[in-house]
């Protein structure tokens, strides 16, 4: 008689959790002709090497100096067409799937109702060009609506940004939860003082600070950082990494007759 053997019941298998991670790449604040060309080339190469599934621009791809209220003597003569053209060239080079408008593009929408027919017409034409570029790229274009504008990537909000202070990353995290933004041109990571412990990521800019005349007298301009963001995301998570493009430290020339 063979001994009776008892087989152990097989342990139930847990259902496989497939996160479906994908790569993303993003920039902010290129400001058309004010772009730092070396940093821009480095960003495009980094994008190509990383081969992201999803690319975004967080806004201020144009500078729109001619439309700036409170502008100086030279701003009003800033030609509209070269500024718009160079900004759209950058978008075509980047080929993003998501284009957010920033506060600089928002000037165009604001001047649609200008009492000056020429200004209103110029704004209308510029906006049409932006829409046409987004359509050619098959990209989603999101108009700037201040604190209400943005799109979700996993569990992080992508937005241009509205706060301009040294604690912007922390304050944005307290407003929105996990958030990736630009606007201040200064790389920063800040934790929100909330029970869910959110993180704000300021991804800097890709501008040449000495070219920005209206910021030449601000101490904070020295903190501007050329950078971009990359990382991975899935339906319910996002893992950003900010990459800083190192620049040489500016030096003052010696006195000629010293």
Regions picked out by a protein language model, each given a short descriptive name:
Residues 156-242:
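Conserved beta-sheet core of the metallophosphoesterase superfamily
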Residues 15-17, 147-154, 191-193:
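Short acidic-hydrophobic surface loop/beta-edge motif
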Residues 1-27, 34, 257:
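Acidic, histidine-bearing metal-coordination/catalytic regions of metal-dependent phosphoesterases
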Residues 31-35, 155-160:
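Short, flexible loop segments at the rims of nucleotide/cofactor-binding pockets, characterized by
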Residues 6-8, 27, 32-134:
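Core catalytic region of metal-dependent phosphoesterases/phosphodiesterases
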Residues 233-258:
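A short C-terminal boundary segment appended to hydrolase-like catalytic domains
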Residues 120-155:
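Metallo-beta-lactamase
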Residues 55-58, 96-102, 143, 158-159, ...:
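A structural signal for short, well-ordered beta-strand segments and their strand-loop junctions
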